[in-house]
Amino acid sequence: RNLRGSFVRVMNIRKEDTTMADVKKVIEIIDKIIADVDEQKLFLTELDNVIGDGDHGINLARGFDAVKTIEDTFESKDIGAILKAIGMKLVSTVGGASGPLYGTAFMKSGALLNGKTEMDMNDFIEMLQVSIDGIMKRGKAVKGEKTMLDAMIPAHDAIKASYEADGDAKKALDAGVKAAEEGIEYTKTIIATKGRASCL
């Protein structure tokens, strides 16, 4: 809910920006994610009650609460190290399949951005791609199986196509959010073939 507002607002990207985020901005984004997950945990759990275990929101919030406990170490780290630390914390604290999947996305992104104190749009696009690749491999999933990939893959493709077309970072992010929202709506029309939902 309110995906467009929360993501685009916290990024605050302008058309002419070449640097997308530095360490300080990454920490701000993580803070926003933590707050949004906490705010939406009951909604996420309600969704999970329908065809899942009914604990997704609570588990995810527990994981990001744990991330909050290590946040005081982030200012001394590079972006890659921050993302890797978050991934490891999520793997160790989020129950079920979600922890390894979210953790994999962060750890793959961390490996990609190892040593970097700034990232640009090309880094972000590649970060989305390695996250998708990691989740596909870890979850043995592909697009069209009613998973997070049905939002992530269209978002990546839309951002990449838009940014390559005219180099407008803000426009590209807007396109990515729109594609993700459309992907979320698409999942309502298909049958789950992964996870507990596939058994119902």
PLM features per residue range, with description:
Residues 16-200:
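N-terminal loops that bind phosphate or other acidic moieties
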Residues 1-19:
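Short, Lys/Arg-enriched N-terminal segments with co-localized hydrophobic residues
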